[in-house]
Amino acid sequence: MNAPVDVTAVRIETERLILRAWRETDLADFYEYARVEGVGEMAGWNHHQSMEESRRILDSFISGKKTFALEWKENGKVIGSLGLEPRDAGLPEELQGREIGYVLSRDYWGRGLMPEAVKAVIDYCFQELSFDYLTCGHFDYNDRSRRVVEKSGFRLLKRVVTSTARGVDEPGKLYVLYNPVKHTDKEKQPCLN
């Protein structure tokens, strides 16, 4: 079952990032990375063609209250997003959780920023929101995302085919991470590995 989420008043700091709610003033930064070919495509959406397209999606981030802006501490620039999306992972109904989805500006790839952000959100979801689990996935062609998932401690749950915003069904893998405080018996946790 999808746990309730509202990140409007949440602020999480890591060594190099601030995770916070999106603001209308983030539009230029958002468009700057979302318009780059290959960035959105790794997450299943087409790169943005206009500032207006980015504005519509930014408005949905703000009203949806489930997506963090990733702000680079060094200069205050928004360089990515991390959302807590609803997903039917096929886990028992009594368990509460969400799926982590993320995108990072190509200029910041290869610096270990996304594992840093994901770890902070895992801690927040398990310690503050008391989620039972989180899921996270990647498309087969996205090795960078696979490495983030693996570094973050997720375990393979199942192979999936996802209908993307690009109108394409993409094969991939879905992983799960159980809250270690609530679920200590690993033998009873549904996983493939």
Question: Which stretches of residues belong to each language-model region?
Answer:
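Soluble sensory domains of the PAS superfamily and closely related sensory modules
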Residues: 61-63
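Acyl-donor (CoA/ACP) binding surface of acyl/acetyltransferases
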Residues: 1-41, 67, 71-193
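Conserved GNAT-fold acetyl-CoA-binding loop/helix
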Residues: 38-59
